[in-house]
Each structure stands twice: as structure tokens, then as C-alpha cells.
């Protein structure tokens, strides 16, 4: 006899299923379940009197060596830029994603996937009612403080690319010895890392020694001179070394205007940092670069989304970040040229249309490490409020396309640009099991658990002397995976292919596995999932700074209230 459950009762027991919609945090965004892998009546449920017991949902004779999972996150809603929005069980084995599907005991349950068998060596994490996203990537990190890693993990970021080592504002780690020392220091961090070398040189020899030492990419920064000669030399070397180049262009237009920079790039792939320009870049029209297929644009989070406070906050930040003197008129003019309300307003819209493909932090160099994810979703909500549903979502009573567009900005797209999408960026089989679990009410602002390489590294945890894990104060705390030698097996250190072949990991005594970046030079805007729009006639007025596409003014109103903000913080 089949028992039929009302939808509300089923959701209370096993989480949402096909057709259910989930509100993300206190935003207006609604995620609708597109597919459920469950076999109704045979759900994998852990606990007293539940199904994941010996001879029931657990196949007793299957060992880990036979293929049983290490972990299964049961009945979780997956929000993923590649897999979409679906419900199922996530299987993890040897630190890698096995798959999203139906887990359990095939001897007693219907529909169990062959590769998702639960055995005595499997730990089941009851994730019904939770949302799982891929671990986030931030590929514009100023490593000024080692404590950035704690804030990154606590917010759901599990991969960090950047440079610097304290005291400097540029996102690069110049020189082979500095690269070596930073790689050795980062061996203590339970995150995936990669470091950029200094790309500002009109001769290639200084670039090569940094890449051979372990730099995973190069950074061109105006404070070191982003001249056409340096740009061309860096990109020419990058083509031979298969590394990505990131650029912070010339705000003052001293060595050329945006047209000269475009000509120097000459059709080669390049990651254009803070493309709007408040973080730096040709004033006032660096934003015009979003309209080209080989330009891979990102934003940094201080200007996202545009609010009534954004303009005033940025002036002071620029003065401090670039060591400017408020008593020197030229320094003040430099700062004021970078901060333009009109281009900041257009930036939100360009994200919503998919013209800007990635979100990053610019940590401690105007941006905030722990706000990449929250500001991404604040922008998505603001755009829904001001612009309505996207055409792809119109009539669905949900926001699935917009949700996939925005989650891709800090997961799969930066992974593709950095050349590491074989390892991270989505919850696809074979990738590192970097997973963030969220309670829907706290989605985008406070993770419940951060899984790194298939093991918990941070989670909401109560007082250690309390009788239960839920005893207050409950706060984000490190877990066992962040400690001892465990952390080395959970992460990857990314270097150039040249450095990997040379064995820098062994030479430097690194315990964390070292892997090469790959495929960076062929990346184009068309490869950016849900964010591949190339406006072919974008113009910035040199006097008013107004942005237009095909003659149509692109702008939005500053927000005076945002979700995922004070409601969640004391």
C-alpha cells in the first residue's frame, strides 16, 4: 500500500522537492527545484529509527575499498552553475565529488546509483532542508594579512588567488624568493591557493623566473607601470607559459588611453580587474572593455551593489589604498577621477545582463574578504527589485536563471579563467569536494558548514563546554579539517605548469599537493557560464560619465536598503 504525503509534510520530513520554491535568505530571490533524484519512500535519512541503518539504507558488506562513500550529504538542494537547481544526495570519496544522485543500499532501496553506495565506512550528514553550493573562489586577493583565510572560509570561499605579502597594495608577489616563501607560508592554510607574480616588465626574463618559481599567473598593476610595452611582453610570455594575466590599467592615462591598452592586448585573453574603474583603470572609460570577447571582466565588491553610501566611501578608500596625500591637489584629483557614480550605477546592470562575468573582493585594498558572496546576492536582489524578472525567468514565478547567473560569478567562471576548473567551481563528479552548506534563511551571508576536500573545516558550532553543539554562543568556528596535518590533504596549491614539472612542491618542502593551472590562454567570454554577453556598442561619455549601449542609457538607482545586511549582524 502506498502512502501519499501532503507536500508540506513531505518537505518537513525530507526537504523540498520538484516544484517547491525556496527563498534565499531575506532576498526576494526564489529558487525552484528542477529535479529530485529521490526515490520517494526510499529516502536516505540518518537518525534514531531512520533508514540509514545496518541492513536497511546501509549495505553492510561494502567497504570503502570496494567503493563505499566516505560521506553522503543526504536530501540536499544543490544550487550549482553547471548542475542547476536540484535535490539529491551528494556522495564524496577520497576528497572528491562522486556525484549527485540517490545514495543508499541497492539491496533494499530502489533507484540507488551504482557509485553512491552507503557502507559501514560512510558517514551520513542529514542535509534535508539545507542548500549546497560549490565552495566559492576569490581570484583577486591582496594577501596583506594571513587572517584573511579565516574570514574567507567563514564566508564560504575555499579558493584564493592573488598576491602581496603585507604592506603593499598590489596583488602580486614579485620575485622567485618571495614566491617561494609565500608558498611555504600558505602550506598552513586549509584553502586552495595560487599566487600572481609581477607582470610589469618590458623584458621577459624577470617574468620567467617568477613563473618558474611557482607563480600561477601574472598581475599587471598601474602602480608598477601598466604600459603598452609591459602589457605586450607579459602577454607574449603568458602565451608560451599557459598562465593567466590579470590587469589593473592606467587610471591617469599617462602611458596611453584605453585604446592603446586594447591594442597592446591584441586579442589575447586577459582578466580585467575591477572593470568599472573605481578600483583603478583608465578614467573614465575602462568599462568599454567589457564589449570584447577576449576581455574577461570582473568586479570587486566595494562598489557592488550601488547604494547611497558607495560614492562617499570610495574616495577615502582610494586615498589610503594608493598612499595618496589629501594635501596634494594632484593626488585628490587622481582619487576623484576614479570614483564615478554613473559608471558604478551601470556596473550593477552589466552584471544583471551577464556582461560582467565574475565577482571578487580586492581584499584589504578597498574590498572586503568575507563579502564576495553576500554582495553578489545583494546585487541580484537589487536588480530583481529594480529591473524585474529576467526574460528567461518571466512567467516562472521563480528566479532560477538569475540565480545561476549570479552563483556562476564566484564559482565556475573564475575557475575557468584561472585554469583550475578541472578541480573546483562546481559540484561535478571528480572535482574537489569543496562544498558550502547553508540554511535557507541564512543563504549568502552565514554558512552552516564549509566542507573542504570532503572534510569539515568551518561550521556553526556552539559552546565547547555545552551539553550540545547547539548551546549558545553558536558561532563560526574551525573544525578538525583546519588543523594538524589534515589540512594538507584537503587542499591544492596551484602553480604554473613549468613550476609543477620542475617539482617546486618537493623542492620547497610543501605538504599540500601541488597542481598546474591549465588552458588559460584559450578562454573567451563565450566560456563564461550565464555571463557571456558582449555589448558591441558600449560608450562612456567623457564629460558626464554616462554609460550607454547602442545609444540606450544604462543605469540604476542607488539602493537605500539591502538584504543580507544588518538583520543578520549584531
Swiss-Prot record:
> What PTM annotation applies here?
Carboxylation allows a single lysine to coordinate two nickel ions.
* EC code: 3.5.1.5
Q: Which InterPro entries match?
A: Amidohydro-rel (IPR006680), Dihydroorotase_CS (IPR002195), Metal-dep_hydrolase_composite (IPR011059), Metal_Hydrolase (IPR032466), Urease_alpha_N_dom (IPR011612), Urease_alpha_subunit (IPR050112), Urease_AS (IPR017950), Urease_asu (IPR005848)
Q: Which organism is it from?
A: Natronomonas pharaonis (strain ATCC 35678 / DSM 2160 / CIP 103997 / JCM 8858 / NBRC 14720 / NCIMB 2260 / Gabara)
Q: Which residues bind substrate?
A: 221
- The residues annotated as the active site are 322
Protein name (record): Urease subunit alpha
Residue ranges occupied by any Urease domain in the UniProt entry:
135-570
The gene that this protein is the product of is ureC
